[in-house]
Amino acid sequence: MMGALSHRRVLDLSRVLAGPWAGQILADLGADVIKVERPGCGDDTRAWGPPFLKDAAGHNTSEAAYYLSANRNKQSVTIDFTRPEGQKLVRELAAKSDIVIENFKVGGLAAHGLDYASLKAINPRLIYCSITGFGQSGPYATRPGYDFMIQALGGLMSLTGLPEGEEGAGPVKVGVALTDILTGLYSTTAILAALAHRDQSDVGQHIDMALLDVQVACLANQAMNYLTTGVAPERLGNAHPNIVPYQSFPTADGDLILTVGNDSQFRKFAEVAGQSQWADDPRFLTNTLRVAHRAELIPLIRQVTVFKATAQWVAVLEAVGVPCAPVNDLAKVFADPQVVARGLAIELPHALGGKVPQVASPIRLSETPVEYRRAPPMLGEHTSVVLEELLGLGGDEVASLRAAGVL
């Protein structure tokens, strides 16, 4: 079965996570994604280990798990485009592509004749997605940007962590590079929008994506809490700024996440907790009142939750329709029956022998389902086949370029 984007080709010049994540989504949807890497070293994340993939004999390879998370379904081609011969090859690939993804510093590719203006001149239908820390304009445009610093600069860390005054209080980053991931998702959305526009106009366009823009946009309700009041939200640990009770609570053997989203659910929770009077208490009648009286209600709940194990709470609360969850580590996540049933852990055969584990795409399309065609590629694994089949180079030409260090 053909993928939804099987008729599209992507030239992925990006490295690390935000750009490769966008490229992997497009590849999962069927696009032919050609990942261009530096000869000899490739994407920085290839070396971001341990852990590293093990081969069929159980020995460590040079393929870091980090790299493996964002590069499946792609072909890897090594080209040194700091050299004229390499620039020519990239331009020829761009002429045969629908989309380019890059995350070099502003102006970084112009020196090699690989910026949007240069490639548009040879392919006016090209969609060119530039991902940077701060965008193509503004006083920070030329600065490098990394997920961790953008989480800090963009306000996310000011909202994450224990409240001031508690032991261990202070700003905390999210446990994954969320700003990079979200930027990859927004980039994919922008690329698909540009493709839809091109279908009508036959004209490509430049996409200017910035990690900081994405981070600020994703402050969502917390941004609006500030913009509507002028008061900056503070860290609340696992608590919610607008809903109570909506946080973690201690149990007899761990923690319980309680996510009471409305007054009806609160009444059910109070009854299950053996504290039905809470639902009729004037301080707790509505969510607005519970938010106002958070400091009084939360200690009362904590005094009750510690008397049952987490699994017991989950069982009785789910039985009456109160949303809740245990706090799972990743071993429990991938053993969870729902995760197993949805097939979120998969394996793909790898060029080094053995198999490479992967997290499946969450996208479920009824007519054009995601296909897992190939494992994340070895460095330069497809250089010869791409240059020979797509650009028409002869084997001798490829060998000559390789000997000269261009490939």
Spans of features found by a protein language model:
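Glycine-rich beta-alpha junction loops
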Residues: 40, 134-135, 211-216, 253, ...
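Conserved Rossmann-fold dehydrogenase catalytic segment
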Residues: 136, 166-177, 199-215, 234-241, ...
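Oxidoreductase and adenylate-handling cofactor-binding alpha/beta cores
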Residues: 162, 184-204, 217-228, 270-277
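Short, well-structured beta-strand/strand-turn elements
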Residues: 33-36, 318-332, 393-398
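N-terminal helix-loop segment corresponding to the beta1-alpha1 unit
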Residues: 1-190, 194-200, 378, 384-407
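Aromatic-enriched alpha-helical interface/lid elements that frame and gate functional surfaces
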Residues: 242-320, 324
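Flexible, small-/acidic-enriched active-site or ligand-binding loops
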Residues: 285, 349-400
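A glycine-rich dinucleotide-binding beta-alpha-beta segment and adjacent secondary-structure elements
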Residues: 319-373
